[in-house]
Amino acid sequence: MPQHTELVVLLDDDGETIGTAPKATVHTRDTALHLAFSCHVFDAQGRILVTRRAIGKLTWPGVWTNSFCGHPAPDEDMREAVHRRAEQELGLELESVELVLPDFRYRATDAAGVVENEICPVFRAVAASPVDPRPEEVGEYQWVDPEQLIPAVAHTPWAFSPWLTLQLPLLYPEHAAHSGLAETAAAAAAVPAA
């Protein structure tokens, strides 16, 4: 049976689609700008689901991050991609999927030199089923109060993904300002991306 090649959508600096490329060829030291998304999932108590990326992941293995991320397929509706990836990565059904940071964009280099270079709209959603993570995607997970997550990221940013570090001050500006996270994120954003 032929193996399915996952494609990512390549973008120009204005965010316009310029083509596609196999996902396996995109995340390198010279990563092209491409389309992705992040999602922050909440439970009925208002806690956020954070996940620790599996050790086998190509980028940022073993670090804590937001609930999940992914790449929409060419011509796939972004909300459909969010639902698809929640099921693939976490065995999770979602409700109330809402776009909260439509213009989020970042570039970061991990310890192995692999670059993420994404226009990455950020969504929030509510869990509609129990979490059943796939071990090849998620090493572990926790439900945490956002007010506890923010100082943890501010004090140990190296333990978290750079996109989470950059997203939290935008999602929770009132808490980030008091925790030092705004300064941590500003410093991370100021690091040249090589």
From Swiss-Prot:
GO terms for biological process: dimethylallyl diphosphate biosynthetic process; isoprenoid biosynthetic process. Residues 32-166 form the Nudix hydrolase domain. Its main location: cytoplasm. It is found in: Cytoplasm. InterPro entries: Idi_bact (IPR056375), IsopentenylPP_isomerase_typ1 (IPR011876), NUDIX_hydrolase-like_dom_sf (IPR015797), NUDIX_hydrolase_dom (IPR000086). One of its GO terms (cellular component) is cytoplasm. Pathway: Isoprenoid biosynthesis; dimethylallyl diphosphate biosynthesis; dimethylallyl diphosphate from isopentenyl diphosphate: step 1/1. Mn(2+) binds at residues 27, 34, 71, 116, 118. It comes from the Bacteria. Keywords: Cytoplasm, Isomerase, Isoprene biosynthesis, Magnesium, Manganese, Metal-binding. Its EC number is 5.3.3.2. It catalyses: isopentenyl diphosphate = dimethylallyl diphosphate. Catalyzes the 1,3-allylic rearrangement of the homoallylic substrate isopentenyl (IPP) to its highly electrophilic allylic isomer, dimethylallyl diphosphate (DMAPP). Belongs to the IPP isomerase type 1 family. This is Isopentenyl-diphosphate Delta-isomerase. The lineage of its organism: Bacteria, Bacillati, Actinomycetota, Actinomycetes, Micrococcales.
